[in-house]
């Protein structure tokens, strides 16, 4: 936070990230206890709850609920497990009705209808984009858990007075490994960026930009369709360069079915363009 000295800021960030790691490892567990989270941060429950809400814009309970529903949505689209099994895996043990109500409130559909719905085609444009300076962190986990690294990045910037809701947020992926290692980033100039953050640039150039609208749990399937079906049908090919996802909404401030994401795929030069 503004006014903290560097040592105090780093100490607070370490404690907060320690608690976040515990939350991310146990969010699906019956044994998760919000008092234990406070212990992991070496804070009283009152101070932990106050600090968490100040930095994250929501309560720990709201974060846990979002993570559980996000995992449930991904499992509904990417597994054959029954709704009851998915509900148990996502913290709704023995209470499928409660899971159905909560899921519908977040996604606008009950779990069965969400699983059965057909992917739609989204608007696509091709344009030239300028380079963008970024501050980023690497993400070595599955894409499903991308929010974990975004939270770490957000906390680091927040404690240094460098975060605001208008910052452009990105994830950066190798085109053939959308579920593998990647980076998460905010658009920031390199000045005053310090460890553990890294600085870099999203390359400018010619991109196909798909304007996606819907839950994050569908993004990997939408990207695969764009890369391997839609672009070839337009006579375009992806360049051997990272795919960029720009997140246009605060994930905890908008309904999950209303999220907007621009998926930007760098394109190979056309015959008329210089290589």
Regions found by a protein language model. Name each.
Residues 42, 46-49, 58, 62-66, ...:
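A solvent-exposed interaction/effector surface
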Residues 2-6, 35-55:
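Basic, low-complexity segments
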